[in-house]
Amino acid sequence: MKHAVKHIHFVGVGGAGMSGIAEILHNLGYTVSGSDQADGAVTRRLAELGIRIFVGHDAAHIAGAQAVVTSTAVKGDNPEVIAARAARIPVVPRAVMLAELMRLKSGIAIAGTHGKTTTTSLVTSVLAEAGLDPTFVIGGKLNSAGANSALGKGDYIVVEADESDASFLNLLPVLSVITNIDADHMDTYGHDFARLKQAFVEFLHKMPFYGAAILCGDDPGVRSIIPMISRPVITYGLGEDVQVRAVDVVALPGGQMRFTCQRRNGTVLPDLEITLNLPGVHSVRNALATIAVATELELPDAPIVSALAKFSGVGRRFQRWGDWPCAAGGEFTLIDDYGHHPVEMAAVIAAARGAFPGRRLVLAFQPHRYTRTRDCFEDFVKVMGSADAILLTEVYAAGEAPIVAADGRSLTRALRVAGKVDPLFVDDVNELPATIAEQALAGDVVIAMGAGTIGGVPARVVELVKERA
């Protein structure tokens, strides 16, 4: 690739997956440029690295490029895409470029509806702790590295495999993890759950015959595809019939999990006593997937235990913003999370209950996509009803047209009718920081959750609280 193409341009370079690939290609010696609709922390960081960044989209931005990479969010009518095609410059999806990077190393791909980013980060951290210096491309910022990607000198590349547009079928890993399979992004699969599951089977069969499928045995969707897989399978979970199992699971106050890991994959290996620096049973399963990967790679036990104990988290995955003064006295705890599906929401609420027992849980949620709100409406109502207080904003459209009865006000009404919690609807997400800063009570645990613009809310809450002090 290097001999044929020297200048690569990214359209939508500010996206989590795009920016990571752009940075790695830059570090490999390519000339990299990119454009995005708006300037932000990610684009500014890329510019500081020496990557030429354009704000806005214009045909002139692709000048000199020999390949153009597009994110899923970029449409065919983008002027840079149109200009590239007119000039017969190859236009390739992000996943195709990621697949090219994976050809340079032995690839470990983490797939699944939920938990991909955290599991990818955990695997990366364990490999780094073992001295393997992996390359990684993650959908969120790995706090210990301060970035969502890095070019390592070792033999492995660890990547997050995205099923949302079926682009993970471009990847060719040697080890693959599937954390779970839930009904999400169903427009891609014709609203057919069987088609979604078949895509995961195809993904696993992209591995060579000597690859291994590391699968969550606790998840019904994953279990249902095991008979269709013709690669070696390693299962993990909390159930009795898995090969990498957690027993004696205890939630520790403050947000850690303690458990014993039993490994029974053909040979019986020593049990591992794990203290995981993440909250929630869902995090235990992500750690088990990581242990299964590390065991398959025959890594020593010490770096596995050490990396899990000191894992410093991922941006916007149960990310703690600290304890802050309430307007009426006392302090509240502020947490940020990317979760945008009812299953993720339930896991985060359960994790918060375990980490902060007895405290009032306030969920500030910005729904993401009208189609997901429609498809998961009743599940959202049920799960949100398990919080103690709810702040709801309007749906973040992500380019979708509004759908009747699948908006924030409809969710608010449905929650009110259900009667478990009386939600407050905040029409403009920009008003949410002030609402949180003014209304949080002493002892509250406030979780700002969603995949849209709510990601900027915690920082603004902190600013407002500091201004008030």
UniProtKB/Swiss-Prot annotation:
Query: What Gene Ontology terms for biological process does this UniProt record contain?
Result: cell division; cell wall organization; peptidoglycan biosynthetic process; regulation of cell shape
Major subcellular location class: cytoplasm
HAMAP family documented for this protein: MurC
Pathway listed for it is:
Cell wall biogenesis; peptidoglycan biosynthesis
A cellular component annotation (GO) from this entry:
cytoplasm
Native species: Leptothrix cholodnii (strain ATCC 51168 / LMG 8142 / SP-6)
Q: What is the name of the protein in this document?
A: UDP-N-acetylmuramate--L-alanine ligase
Q: Which InterPro entries match?
A: Mur-like_cat_sf, Mur_ligase_C, Mur_ligase_C_dom_sf, Mur_ligase_cen, Mur_ligase_N, MurCDEF_pg_biosynth, UDP-N-AcMur_Ala_ligase_MurC
The EC code for this enzyme is 6.3.2.8
List of residues binding ATP: 112-118
Keyword hit for Amino-acid biosynthesis: no
Keywords assigned by UniProt, alphabetized:
ATP-binding, Cell cycle, Cell division, Cell shape, Cell wall biogenesis/degradation, Cytoplasm, Ligase, Nucleotide-binding, Peptidoglycan synthesis
Show the catalytic activity. Answer: UDP-N-acetyl-alpha-D-muramate + L-alanine + ATP = UDP-N-acetyl-alpha-D-muramoyl-L-alanine + ADP + phosphate + H(+)
